[in-house]
UniProtKB/Swiss-Prot annotation:
Stated role: May act at the level of sigma-G activity or its stability. SpoIID is probably required for engulfment.
Biased composition (Basic and acidic residues): 37-51
Name of the protein: Stage II sporulation protein D
GO cellular component entries: outer membrane-bounded periplasmic space
Organism: Bacillus amyloliquefaciens (Bacillus velezensis)
Keywords attached to this entry: Sporulation
Gene Ontology biological process terms, A to Z: sporulation resulting in formation of a cellular spore
NCBIfam families: SpoIID_LytB, spore_II_D
Disulphides: none
UniProt region (Disordered), positions on chain: 35-59
Amino acid sequence: MKPIVFLLSGLCVLILLVPTILVLPFQAEKGAAVNREPGHKTAHTIRETKGAEPTLKESPVSVPVYRTSNHSVENIPLEEYVIGVVASEMPVEFKPEALKAQALAARTFIVRLMVANSASRPRKGSLVDDTQMFQVYKSKSQLKKEWGSDYAQNLKKITNAVAGTQGKILTYENKPIEASFFSTSNGYTENAEAYWTSAIPYLKSVKSPWDKKSPKYLATRTFSVPEFQQKLGVQLAGQDTVGQITARTPGHQVATAVINGKKLKGRDIREKLGLRSADFEWKRNGGTITITTKGFGHGVGMSQYGANYMAEQGKSVTDIVKHYYQGVDISEADSFLSKYMAKK
């Protein structure tokens, strides 16, 4: 009889202990998640919305935009402004994740201007104009004329991309970044200091091999010798030579070239000749000079075609922006918008 009593007692103790043993590891895990160091910053990502479409919420602020067509300032709700920029700056045929990346860049660009101590304003009462001097913006009526019968489906696609990133911007060390972008790289993006004047830690050269599939990857321009000399302010030596490319940048663009003893920057050559990029090769054939370029744009920041090809391979908007903008976070724009409203 006693053995049975002991057996029953042991079973009772075991029944009481098992739930406690099972629960303890989960309590420890919850505690570890809660007890973070003070000031810990969680990096945000953009969640993919499968099935249900995101809803575009009312914008907390408006952007005063100088409309060059009628010479007036129009106050456009922030997210509506981003829609007009994405629709104008990136082909609507691009993949949704690429359009989201463009929306993040566009929103970051304007929020950065909002909180800047000094900004180049096109007209009194405006923050930006609607040209490429800032960001190209088109209204819905303009887009309707441009898209015709495709207007409804195109607008829906762009709106979904903007809604999927609404309220989010790109930051570095808790500040909105210089979210520069361009059409097509030569296979690499460019260091900021190689094209502009100052180094920017998140704008560093990265590989972008997908761009070789872009329809804008290669281009050719032909100049007469007199035209070439006049545009660059040089005199060519000999009958068959042009000059020597003497240095290239980290992004494989021309840094410097020498033409008959005169040293020129690759960027200056590009701009004076109206070339698509500063990655070029030249060849003289009698009285003409043929220049072949790789890529389209300054090369600093996000390649739009590269972003689209990444999206085609299944990469997310987070993957895209963190590839082209090194070390950035995806952050809420609210605190920056509050500062802007306080300044007003």
